[in-house]
Amino acid sequence: MTKFLILILCTLTLKFSYSESYVKAGDSLVWDSENKSYNANGDVEFKNDKFIAFADEMIAQYMENNNKEIFTIVELFENVKIEFKDEIFRGDYAIYTRDNNIIKLIGDVSIQSPSRLLTGNELIADIDNNKRILNSANDGSLVE
């Protein structure tokens, strides 16, 4: 019976909803109230009022405001995919900081929009100013 319950818990998608954001995880979701963080593994999905992100693993820091959890820093690991408006960002690693609304992706990065596909090894996406900086492996090339 115990093995059956563990199997069910491991296969269920865990979901925690907040006023503007949520985290889902296919394997595990660990809440650390002392350090105000979440660790998620397996088919991770994170959504806030700006974008939705998918990855194999996530570590998220939050702060409490009016009894609500507001995610301030979100790190995504492996097979990262971020959907923002009509664009899709992909990379090996991403970090989002709420203070400046910047997403930074590293490693095998791409930006896909309806009219183009750009690739590189680092992307800095300034959400508030609608600006993208894509760096390639060659230090001499830059796309803005």
Task: State each model region's role.
Residues 1-144:
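Mature-chain termini and adjacent capping regions
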